[in-house]
Amino acid sequence: MQTWSDVLGQEKKQAYFQETMDFVRREREAGKIVYPPAADVFNAFKYTEFADVKVVILGQDPYHGPNQAHGLCFSVLPGVAVPPSLVNIYKELHRDIPGFEIPSHGYLLSWAQQGVLLLNTVLTVEAGKAHSHASSGWEHFTDRVIAALNEHREGLVFLLWGNHAQKKGQYIDRQRHHVLMAPHPSPLSAHRGFLGCGHFSQTNQFLTDADKQPINWQIAPIA
């Protein structure tokens, strides 16, 4: 059974990856606040092993406010206000999935544990500065992640919301995988087709058709 180490081990030895890690370390050492904390940068891979991935949701870069980002796209830690994009994701789930109750928090760990890879395409950001690390090499790394999933797995469901994610997904083999596209759930664009897209029920239909366990999208209350 292949692991992330098997498919990305060589990638992490590449010069560009070392340069990205050096850049982020220097930013932190210079006193800049970088999100998420160093221990959380690779959480998407920690919580969803390569062989367990069923669904891929692509984000852009991490939330850049205090205490928000923790390495899973769109997710925030318990106790942090649910960000606007995730509010819209919950609205669509409530519309799309019978019985879905809108949670009071935005902690999406249970999705990751069921095989939903919550992957930002840029894995770090400077506090208060959206896209500040966009050209630091992360994009190349996450391209390789998507390429590895495309090549070594079959029947994955990719949810590509917004132009950035759709551009990243242009090399996914549509014969091997399912690709669902919609506008970004941000308040700026959700009304253009994200709300009403039905991606969550469609995802579960694809999984069920392939004799895979569907995702339980309901987020349980924090005890």
From Swiss-Prot:
One of its GO terms (biological process) is base-excision repair, AP site formation via deaminated base removal. The active site is at D61. This is Uracil-DNA glycosylase. Pfam families: UDG. It catalyses: Hydrolyzes single-stranded DNA or mismatched double-stranded DNA and polynucleotides, releasing free uracil. Its EC number is 3.2.2.27. GO terms for cellular component: cytoplasm. Excises uracil residues from the DNA which can arise as a result of misincorporation of dUMP residues by DNA polymerase or due to deamination of cytosine. It comes from Tolumonas auensis (strain DSM 9187 / NBRC 110442 / TA 4). One of its GO terms (molecular function) is uracil DNA N-glycosylase activity. Gene3D superfamilies: Uracil-DNA glycosylase-like domain. The gene is ung. It is found in: Cytoplasm. It is an enzyme of class 3 (hydrolase). Keywords: Cytoplasm, DNA damage, DNA repair, Hydrolase. Belongs to the uracil-DNA glycosylase (UDG) superfamily. UNG family. InterPro entries: UDG_fam1, Ura-DNA_Glyclase_AS, Uracil-DNA_glycosylase-like, Uracil-DNA_glycosylase-like_sf. SUPFAM superfamilies: Uracil-DNA glycosylase-like (SSF52141).
